[in-house]
């Protein structure tokens, strides 16, 4: 038996708004029919677009640092930092460790994510 990663799921206060933000970040359209309760990116697509991103409204707010977070790669870290801040992300920190550079952000609901300078 084998498994594969089907989805990355975010608990959130407003699924449609957070999906719209991440759709812009990922440059992928939000699936039709998204609501404040549930929205997705790529769930309606083929398995080739997996993992999909899902957003599910929950009653409680975020109270602690994420134990898991997405890491995204960017050919131009500086340009991507500007683009993400313009989209509504909050820049938290810049790191350079053993020649690997990345920036940590918060999405509009406070979820951490990193953008790593793609070495290629």
Describe the residue ranges of each PLM region:
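Vicinal oxygen chelate
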Residues: 5-12, 41, 58-83, 101-106
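Amphipathic alpha-helical interaction segments
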Residues: 29-30, 61, 110-113
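Short, flexible active-site-adjacent loop segments at beta-strand->alpha-helix junctions, enriched
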Residues: 45, 59, 76, 95, ...
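Conserved beta-strand in the GNAT
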Residues: 51-56, 114
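Short, compact, well-ordered microdomains
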Residues: 84-86, 90-117
């Amino acid at each position: 038996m084998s498994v594969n990663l089907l989805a990355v799921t975010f608990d959130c206060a407003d699924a449609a708004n957070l999906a719209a933000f991440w759709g812009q970040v990922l440059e992928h359209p939000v699936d039709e029919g998204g609501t404040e309760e549930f929205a997705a990116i790529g769930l309606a697509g083929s398995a080739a677009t997996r993992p999909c991103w899902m957003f599910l409204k929950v009653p409680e707010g975020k109270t602690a640092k994420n134990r898991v977070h997405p890491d995204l790669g960017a050919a131009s870290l500086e340009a991507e930092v500007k683009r993400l801040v313009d989209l509504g992300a909050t820049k938290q920190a810049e790191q350079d460790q053993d020649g690997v550079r990345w920036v940590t952000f918060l999405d509009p609901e406070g979820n951490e994510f990193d953008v790593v300078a793609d070495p290629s």
